[in-house]
Amino acid sequence: MSVYKYTNFIVQNIDQLFHTDFGPFHLLLPIGLSFYTFQSAGYILDVYWNRCEPEKNVFRFALFVSFFPQILQGPIGRFDRLTKTLYAEHEFDWQRIERGVQRIIWGFFKKMLIADTAAVFVDAIFNQYQTYNGIAILGVLAYSAQLYADFSGGVDVVIGVAELFGVEMDENFKRPYFAVSITDFWHRWHITLGTWMKDYVFYPVSLSGWMGKFGKFAKKKFGKTYGRALPICVANLIVFLVVGIWHGAAWKFIVYGIYNGVIIAFSGLMTKNYREWKKKLHIDDKSTGWHIFQIIRTFLLVNISWYFDRADTIPQALTMMKNSVTHFEPAQILNIQFGQMNLKYTPVFIAVLLVCCAICFVVSFLQERGTKIRQSLSTKIWVIRWAIYLAMIFAMPLLGRMPDTAGGFIYAQF
C-alpha cells in the first residue's frame, strides 16, 4: 500500500528539494487498496495477539477480505464481528430484504440529492477560489454537507446491500455533526477507521516501553496531572498523523491529521483547567444552551479541517480561510456556472439542496433523541412505506443536479 500510494509523493518532494527529475511513476492503484489492507492487517494482528482463531479455509478468508460491498469505501470489517453473519447460513426473509432496500434508497437519496447537488457548488468555489472569493465560507459549509452525505450515503448503500444477503456490517457514522468535541466527532465519524487506529496504533504506542519511560519522565518534570496526560497526547498526535497520511499522499492531508491531533491533545492537557473555568463561570454541563454551544463550536472546528481536506494545496486552504472572515459576497452564488452548457446555480437548485439537508438534519435529530426511525416506519402499512420509497426514488433524477464528475464516491479514492 505504501509503495502504491506514497512513492510519487516521496519522489516529488525529492525532486523539489534536490532539483532532480526522477518521477512521476505511473502506477495502477488497485481498487479499495487501503480498506482491504487495513482489514487484512487487523486480522493478522488479532491472530498474532490471540484475539481470534486463525481461519484455516483460504476461501472463507478470501470472502472476509473481499466481500464485495465494502471494497470501495468500507466499513473496515473486523474478523470476529463480520464473520458471525458472513459465514452463517441464510434463508430468504422478505422483511430483511425490505430493510436492505430501505437503507439503499436512503443512501442514494443523500448521495444524489445532497452530495452531488452540493458538489456543483463546492467544485466551482474551490476550483476557482480566486473568482468566488466572496463565498469561500459557503463553499466549505457546502463541502461539509457534501462529504457527509457522500460518505455516509455510500456506507448506507453498502450496509443495505450486505443486509440483502443477511450480513451485518459495523456502522460507520453516528450523527457526527451533533458531536460536542473533536474527540466525540471522531467517535462518530468513520467509526471503523477510528476503532482500527485505537486498537492497532494508539494502544500499542501508548503501552510501549518508550512511552512508559516518557511518562515517568513527564511525571517528574511536570507533575502527576500532566505526566499522565502527555503520553496520551503524544499517542493521539501519532494516531492522527497516521490518519492524515492514510487520507492521501499530500502535505495538506498531513496538516489535516496534525490539526485534529493537536486539538485532541490540547483538550486532553487542559481537561483540569476546563473544569475549573466552568466552575468559576457557573456553567452547567447539562444545560441545553451549553450543549448547543459545544455542537456549534465543534462544527466550526471541524469545518476548519475541511479547508485542508478539500483544497488542492495548503496555501489555497489558508487563502480561503482568510477570505471566509474578511470577504463575504453571497450574491456570487448566483453567478456559479457548471456543465458543458454553463448552466447557472439557480435559487431552485439551492432550495432543493437546503430542503434535502433539512430532511437529513431532522432524521438525524430524531435519531439523536432516541427515535427509531426505521422501526417506526416498519409499523406503517405497506402502501405508506412504499409510497415513501417511490417518492424518494423518483425525486433523485428529477431534482438532483449532478456535476460532470458525478458518479463516484469521494472516499473510493482512498
Tell where the protein language model's regions lie, with residue ranges:
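Membrane-embedded transmembrane alpha-helical bundles that form the catalytic cores
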Residues: 1-363, 367-413
